[in-house]
Design a protein with these regions (language model features):
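TPR/TPR-like (Sel1-like) alpha-helical repeat modules
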Residues: 100, 119-140, 151
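Conserved small-residue packing positions in alpha-helical repeats and bundles
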Residues: 1-5, 42, 79, 112, ...
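Alpha-helical adaptor scaffolds
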Residues: 14, 32-106
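Short extracytoplasmic
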Residues: 1-32
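Alpha-helical linker/edge segments of TPR/alpha-solenoid repeat scaffolds
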Residues: 43-52, 80-91, 117-126, 150-169
Length: 180
């Protein structure tokens, strides 16, 4: 976690954040503040490398009635945590069929990442293409990252294209023999 100035929180500050987050969850469990507190605790847990605690905090939020907009973000974060824990199939199941609204691009990109982890390049390509088509971000960096991912999994569409390339290469060899 960082402060607005970009400095990293110290250990004492992280402990204080966790204590306040626990208090918010306990005293105001039905509010958005409690869900944001759980998300912050999950973020701190990920930074510490405690993916189990991160998953518990995010699951708490889902189990305790997060509003739809918050639930969409929490579900995606939980799926990413589960994937990092090695539960990639579960992660994919968690986000399949979800009406992700304005977060469709992020969901599709995550699906692509999960498919890559499962060794399914074709499905990853389809998901990344869907992410680009629904990209709610105007950030060129975001779009460029998606384009790089697409380039890594783009299927070979037609082997005849490569035959044509080989024929051209053969012609080059013939031309170089004529020159000699």
């Amino acid at each position: 976690a960082t402060e607005d100035s970009g400095r990293t929180l110290g250990l004492d500050q992280k402990i204080a954040v966790n204590e306040k987050a626990d208090q918010l969850k306990l005293e105001f469990s039905g509010t958005a503040y409690a869900h944001f507190a759980a998300a912050m605790k999950a973020k701190l847990a990920v930074e510490k490398g405690d993916l189990e605690l991160a998953a518990e905090e995010l699951q708490w939020s889902l189990d305790n009635g997060a509003e739809k907009a918050t639930e969409i973000i929490i579900r995606l974060r939980l799926a990413r945590v589960e994937s990092a824990r090695g539960n990639t199939e579960l992660a994919l199941e968690m986000i399949q069929g979800v009406d992700s609204g304005a977060h469709k691009s992020a969901y599709e990109e995550a699906k692509g990442d999960f498919y890559i982890q499962l060794g399914d390049s074709e499905s990853a390509f389809t998901a990344y293409e869907a992410a680009v088509m629904s990209n709610e971000s105007t950030s060129p960096v975001s779009r460029n990252i998606l384009e790089l991912k697409i380039g890594q999994v783009r299927p070979i569409e037609n082997s005849a294209e490569f035959d044509g390339v080989n024929e051209l290469a053969g012609d080059d060899d013939a031309m170089s023999e004529d020159i000699r």
